[in-house]
């Protein structure tokens, strides 16, 4: 048992059928023909068996798909006559494996049966004698001397060609008495004539490529129009949608569910897209912080009245902890009940019901003050008085006391001072504007206007900064 000899086959093929060599003896030719036919039979049997297996596999896959189709068709026929709404949930992922199965060749795993050992036969016949004439005839049909070397490409050579092997120096490459390399570029020159030859710099300057001509827009001074960039954004358009007047409910329709109700508010459509449409956020029912307006009466914070009835105005403006207390509040109108009577018996240390937590139990003075200011909404909502207003009130009170003190004298200077004070109040808008016209006569008023204001009499020297006249 010996392995087969050299086989002539194509590259990449699993099977290789051997060829029968010419000029064999009769017994050798018969044996090789039988072996080749037997090998070909094995190869063909293997190929057809593999094809049959692949066909059976494809048939089983088609049968499974057909069963799924018939099952889906039966389900559709079952629910076709139903009048109830049916929800169909589609899978979020495509029903396919994450990694696709690679395609396998039908000849994957096939082995060449020719690699198996075949029986060795002994032939008794002798070789035929050599015939020279027959060999010469075969040379006409079977070329023996084939030049497999690729032919070199014909290159256009300007010089003498390749360098000879007997050149020993670089000067042998140059033409006598010149700088021309004849092996690179052959030129006809007289070495003894002393002709000036072109240098390599000059030759390079001649062969230097020139720039292309300027475009027509530059050469002819033409003005190119600016190209408007194309808009590639997707802008869907529904066009003219006709208004169809149909009834909202059509009973007893085949294939239409009766228990399905559609909501009229389906939200904004997806086409055409509204670039500036902002969806409305859901409303959350939360408690809105009301501005804090504490009432200070007799050193005790009073609770704010309940929300349903309108709260009466506070008898005194709110005062923070870090600000000195204001003068006694004015009396409330006769129509409103007094709050101080009800809350007078309450202890100052007890917390007031309904007051914010920060006021009842402050954690730190500064944080509580800032938080109460934020809840109150600032000066505009809390109706807090500034220090400047309190100074003005103090000035008014002192002026009134001075007017009362000077009005008791009855002299000319005190009357003049009173008239000037009333005149200045009317001009500045801080008092009644008719104060100057209530005098005994117009001449006295004109005289009071022409006299500059005098400093108030009996003014203590330590209160000059606080009692300056307001312009």
Curated annotation (Swiss-Prot):
<dbReference type="GO" id="GO:0031901">
    <property type="term" value="C:early endosome membrane"/>
</dbReference>
<dbReference type="Pfam" id="PF11945">
    <property type="entry name" value="WASH_WAHD"/>
</dbReference>
<dbReference type="GO" id="GO:0071203">
    <property type="term" value="C:WASH complex"/>
</dbReference>
<keyword id="KW-0009">Actin-binding</keyword>
<comment type="subunit">
    <text>Component of the WASH core complex also described as WASH regulatory complex SHRC composed of WASHC1, WASHC2, WASHC3, WASHC4 and WASHC5. The WASH core complex associates with the F-actin-capping protein dimer (formed by CAPZA1, CAPZA2 or CAPZA3 and CAPZB); the assembly has been initially described as WASH complex. Interacts (via WHD1 region) with WASHC2; the interaction is direct. Interacts with alpha-tubulin. Interacts with BECN1; WASHC1 and AMBRA1 can competitively interact with BECN1. Interacts with BLOC1S2; may associate with the BLOC-1 complex.</text>
</comment>
<dbReference type="GO" id="GO:0034314">
    <property type="term" value="P:Arp2/3 complex-mediated actin nucleation"/>
</dbReference>
<dbReference type="GO" id="GO:0005814">
    <property type="term" value="C:centriole"/>
</dbReference>
<dbReference type="GO" id="GO:0015031">
    <property type="term" value="P:protein transport"/>
</dbReference>
<dbReference type="GO" id="GO:0003779">
    <property type="term" value="F:actin binding"/>
</dbReference>
<feature type="region of interest" description="Required for WASH complex assembly">
    <location>
        <begin position="1"/>
        <end position="54"/>
    </location>
</feature>
<feature type="compositionally biased region" description="Gly residues">
    <location>
        <begin position="428"/>
        <end position="442"/>
    </location>
</feature>
<dbReference type="GO" id="GO:0032456">
    <property type="term" value="P:endocytic recycling"/>
</dbReference>
<comment type="similarity">
    <text>Belongs to the WASH1 family.</text>
</comment>
<keyword id="KW-0967">Endosome</keyword>
<feature type="domain" description="WH2">
    <location>
        <begin position="365"/>
        <end position="387"/>
    </location>
</feature>
<feature type="region of interest" description="WHD1">
    <location>
        <begin position="1"/>
        <end position="167"/>
    </location>
</feature>
<keyword id="KW-0206">Cytoskeleton</keyword>
<feature type="region of interest" description="VCA">
    <location>
        <begin position="353"/>
        <end position="471"/>
    </location>
</feature>
<dbReference type="GO" id="GO:0043014">
    <property type="term" value="F:alpha-tubulin binding"/>
</dbReference>
<dbReference type="InterPro" id="IPR021854">
    <property type="entry name" value="WASH1_WAHD"/>
</dbReference>
<keyword id="KW-0813">Transport</keyword>
<feature type="compositionally biased region" description="Pro residues">
    <location>
        <begin position="304"/>
        <end position="336"/>
    </location>
</feature>
<keyword id="KW-0963">Cytoplasm</keyword>
<feature type="compositionally biased region" description="Basic and acidic residues">
    <location>
        <begin position="386"/>
        <end position="402"/>
    </location>
</feature>
<comment type="function">
    <text>Acts as a component of the WASH core complex that functions as a nucleation-promoting factor (NPF) at the surface of endosomes, where it recruits and activates the Arp2/3 complex to induce actin polymerization, playing a key role in the fission of tubules that serve as transport intermediates during endosome sorting. Involved in endocytic trafficking of EGF. Involved in transferrin receptor recycling. Regulates the trafficking of endosomal alpha5beta1 integrin to the plasma membrane and involved in invasive cell migration.</text>
</comment>
<dbReference type="GO" id="GO:0005829">
    <property type="term" value="C:cytosol"/>
</dbReference>
<dbReference type="GO" id="GO:0005776">
    <property type="term" value="C:autophagosome"/>
</dbReference>
<dbReference type="GO" id="GO:0005770">
    <property type="term" value="C:late endosome"/>
</dbReference>
<dbReference type="GO" id="GO:0055038">
    <property type="term" value="C:recycling endosome membrane"/>
</dbReference>
<dbReference type="InterPro" id="IPR028290">
    <property type="entry name" value="WASH1"/>
</dbReference>
<feature type="compositionally biased region" description="Acidic residues">
    <location>
        <begin position="462"/>
        <end position="471"/>
    </location>
</feature>
<dbReference type="GO" id="GO:0006887">
    <property type="term" value="P:exocytosis"/>
</dbReference>
<feature type="region of interest" description="Disordered">
    <location>
        <begin position="297"/>
        <end position="471"/>
    </location>
</feature>
<dbReference type="GO" id="GO:0016197">
    <property type="term" value="P:endosomal transport"/>
</dbReference>
<dbReference type="InterPro" id="IPR003124">
    <property type="entry name" value="WH2_dom"/>
</dbReference>
<protein>
    <recommendedName>
        <fullName>WASH complex subunit 1</fullName>
    </recommendedName>
</protein>
<keyword id="KW-0653">Protein transport</keyword>
<keyword id="KW-0968">Cytoplasmic vesicle</keyword>
<dbReference type="GO" id="GO:0055037">
    <property type="term" value="C:recycling endosome"/>
</dbReference>
<dbReference type="GO" id="GO:0042147">
    <property type="term" value="P:retrograde transport, endosome to Golgi"/>
</dbReference>
<dbReference type="GO" id="GO:0043015">
    <property type="term" value="F:gamma-tubulin binding"/>
</dbReference>
<keyword id="KW-0472">Membrane</keyword>
């Amino acid at each position: 048992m010996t392995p087969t000899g050299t086989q002539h086959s194509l590259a990449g093929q699993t099977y290789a059928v051997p060829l029968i060599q010419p000029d064999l003896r009769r017994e050798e030719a018969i044996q090789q023909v039988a072996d080749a036919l037997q090998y070909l039979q094995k190869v063909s049997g293997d190929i057809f068996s593999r094809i049959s297996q692949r066909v059976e596999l494809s048939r089983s896959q088609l049968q499974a798909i057909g069963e799924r189709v018939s099952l889906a068709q039966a389900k559709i026929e079952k629910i076709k006559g139903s009048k109830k709404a049916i929800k169909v949930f589609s899978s979020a992922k495509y029903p396919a494996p994450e990694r696709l199965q690679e395609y396998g060749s039908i000849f994957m795993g096939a082995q060449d049966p020719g690699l198996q050992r075949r029986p060795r036969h002994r032939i008794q016949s002798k070789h035929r004698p050599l015939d020279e004439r027959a060999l010469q005839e075969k040379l006409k049909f079977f070329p023996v001397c084939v030049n497999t070397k690729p032919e070199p490409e014909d290159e256009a050579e300007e010089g003498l060609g390749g360098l000879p092997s007997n050149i020993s120096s670089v000067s042998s490459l140059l033409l006598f008495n010149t700088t021309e390399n004849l092996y690179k570029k052959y030129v006809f020159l007289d070495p003894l004539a002393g002709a000036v030859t072109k240098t390599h710099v000059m030759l390079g300057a001649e062969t230097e490529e020139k720039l292309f001509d300027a475009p027509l827009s530059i050469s002819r001074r033409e003005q190119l129009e600016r190209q408007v960039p194309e808009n590639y954004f997707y802008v869907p358009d529904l066009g003219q949608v006709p208004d169809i007047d149909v009834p909202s409910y059509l009973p007893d329709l085949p294939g239409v569910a009766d228990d399905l109700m559609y909501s009229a508010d389906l939200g904004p459509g997806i086409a055409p897209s509204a670039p500036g449409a902002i969806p409305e956020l859901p409303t959350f029912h939360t408690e809105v912080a009301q501005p804090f307006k504490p009432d200070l009466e007799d050193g005790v914070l009073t609770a704010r009245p309940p929300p349903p009835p309108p709260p009466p105005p506070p008898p005194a403006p709110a005062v923070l902890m870090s600000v000195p207390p204001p003068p006694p509040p004015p009396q409330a109108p006769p129509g409103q009940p007094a709050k101080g009577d009800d809350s007078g018996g309450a202890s100052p240390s007890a917390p007031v019901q309904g007051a914010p937590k920060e006021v009842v139990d402050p954690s730190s003075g500064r944080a509580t003050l800032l938080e109460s200011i934020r809840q109150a909404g600032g000066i505009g909502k809390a109706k807090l008085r500034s220090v400047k207003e309190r100074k003005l009130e103090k000035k008014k009170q002192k002026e009134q006391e001075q007017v009362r003190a000077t009005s008791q004298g009855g002299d000319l200077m005190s009357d003049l001072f009173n008239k000037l004070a009333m005149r200045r109040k009317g001009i500045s808008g801080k008092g009644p504007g008719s104060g100057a016209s209530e005098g005994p006569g117009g001449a006295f008023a004109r005289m009071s206007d022409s006299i500059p204001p005098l400093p108030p009499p009996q003014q203590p020297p330590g209160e000059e900064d606080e009692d300056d006249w307001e312009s």
